[in-house]
From Swiss-Prot:
It comes from Oryza sativa subsp. japonica (Rice). It holds the Pfam family B3. GO terms for molecular function: DNA binding. It is found in: Nucleus. InterPro entries: B3_DNA-bd, DNA-bd_pseudobarrel_sf. It comes from the Eukaryota. This is Putative B3 domain-containing protein LOC_Os07g12820. GO terms for cellular component: nucleus. Residues 4-99 bind DNA. SUPFAM superfamilies: DNA-binding pseudobarrel domain. Keywords: DNA-binding, Nucleus, Transcription, Transcription regulation.
Length: 267
């Protein structure tokens, strides 16, 4: 292949078991029934899918269901998927939300940020760019030994979705190596109330019960509860005698997790 081929697909099918393969991908990769494709994403997900023919059309079948589950896609979501044909057997997959933004954006300066944040005690990083220079298809891969368990303080009994784990991996390169954060899951933003009593929150690490945190979250979310708050930041400070699981860091930054009800408390 002399140049990469791009093809966008709107995910509208009600089935998780298959996906029609775009004609452009079929031609570029010269696909046939029985072939195998490797789907790859920016956060390192690599899954092989089988190609099958039905009614003169090719579909991704075995492996596609596993891919959408690992990528954090949900039924009923309005998503656009861009396939970038890397070779006859490899496709780079970029997922966009309904507003047209990459669901897991990685800025152009990722490679530079990684180099600047390194220290002699930090693990080695390798960074490479595999995308064309057009800003709409920017994609930087970063390989790091840091894993979710090293960075995220959460109760082991709390099951993290694939999307949350993928988002954690994507933002890891922009945090200091010593940085950790806590995940708080809000069952329903509208159920958070100011005042005394128990708040309808599940804490990711131990039991985060400081009312001032809940009040600040409520204050910041109540005005935006009717809007899409995915990826937006909250900023508030804690008094020195308040803490999150024993950490008295101030100020506290919080971020809404994209497409979830989770909030990150960055410490």
């Amino acid at each position: 292949m002399h140049s990469p081929t791009f093809s966008m697909v709107k995910i509208k099918t009600a089935s998780q078991d298959y996906l029609p393969i775009p004609v452009a991908v079929t031609k570029a990769s010269r696909l046939k029934h029985g072939r195998t494709l490797k789907l790859m994403t920016a956060h390192g997900l690599k899954i092989r899918v089988k190609v099958a023919e039905a009614r003169d059309k090719l579909y991704m079948t075995i492996g596609w269901k596993e891919f959408i589950q690992e990528a954090g896609l949900k039924m009923g979501e309005s998503k656009s998927v861009v396939f970038r044909t890397l070779s006859k057997s490899r496709l780079n997959v970029i997922i966009f939300n309904k507003e047209g933004y990459s669901r897991c954006p990685i800025p152009d300066k990722a490679a530079k940020a990684l180099i600047n944040n390194q220290s002699s005690s930090a693990p080695s990083f390798s960074t490479k760019s595999t995308a064309p220079r057009h800003p709409s298809f920017t994609n930087v891969e970063a390989n790091t030994k840091r894993i979710v368990k090293d960075m995220c303080c959460y109760n082991k009994r709390m099951k993290l979705s694939s999307e949350v784990k993928n988002y954690v991996r994507d933002i890891a390169q922009f945090l200091d190596y010593s940085s950790k954060f806590y995940i708080v899951t809000m069952k329903n933003i509208h159920e958070v109330r100011q005042g005394d009593g128990c708040y309808n929150l599940k804490a990711g690490y131990g039991q985060i019960s400081h009312k001032i945190i809940f009040k600040e979250i409520y204050s910041a979310t109540s005005t935006a509860s009717q809007q899409d708050t995915s990826g937006k930041n909250l900023h508030f400070s804690l008094p020195q005698d308040e803490s999150v699981a024993g950490n008295s860091t101030s100020p506290v930054n919080a971020m809404f997790m994209p497409c979830t009800s989770n909030i990150l408390l960055l410490l």
